[in-house]
């Protein structure tokens, strides 16, 4: 009789679970994702397609190749409606390290425990150690990074932004 039980258990679940995706985010995050989705869905048909991606990237001054757009579209298992968009972001965000792990990685180079690292020193570390960044990648990182007038990179705030998004200027 036990062999019948094991047969019924092994039948389920090759499917992607999207039903709980809305529970992963609070209302304000869902609203921000909805606004982003609507900006990308240029033709307003409720789905993001290759043309929508191209138009959105072009509006940002980028000129993406067909191969690049195809690679982006292939990350989705099917048509990208809002639920799929949210699911994909949830998977990406769940794939990042926990906040304390990221913060502690930066803290290793913060000998004074100030919560900041001198931006030139951090650039040197990022371009010469481990999985090396290019100067362009560091420039992109610094573009929206919390760096004060003295050139101190606030890694505590940066980690918060990385995991939770930037605060609005109005806040």
Curated annotation (Swiss-Prot):
Q: Which PROSITE patterns match?
A: EF_HAND_1, EF_HAND_2
Statement: the UniProt record of this protein carries the keyword Cell membrane: no
Which keywords has UniProt assigned to this entry? Calcium, Metal-binding, Motor protein, Muscle protein, Myosin, Phosphoprotein, Repeat
InterPro entries assigned to the protein according to its UniProt record, in alphabetical order? EF-hand-dom_pair (IPR011992), EF_Hand_1_Ca_BS (IPR018247), EF_hand_DJBP (IPR015070), EF_hand_dom (IPR002048), Myosin_RLC (IPR050403)
List GO molecular-function terms, semicolon-separated.
calcium ion binding; myosin heavy chain binding
Q: Which GO terms describe its biological process?
A: platelet aggregation
Gene3D superfamilies hit by this protein: EF-hand (1.10.238.10)
EF-hand domain residues:
28-63, 97-132, 133-168
- Residues that hold Ca(2+) according to the record: 41, 43, 45, 52
Misc: This chain binds calcium.
| Job of this protein | Myosin regulatory subunit that plays an important role in regulation of both smooth muscle and nonmuscle cell contractile activity via its phosphorylation. Implicated in cytokinesis, receptor capping, and cell locomotion.
Question: What is this protein's name?
Answer: Myosin regulatory light chain 12A
State the organism of origin: Homo sapiens
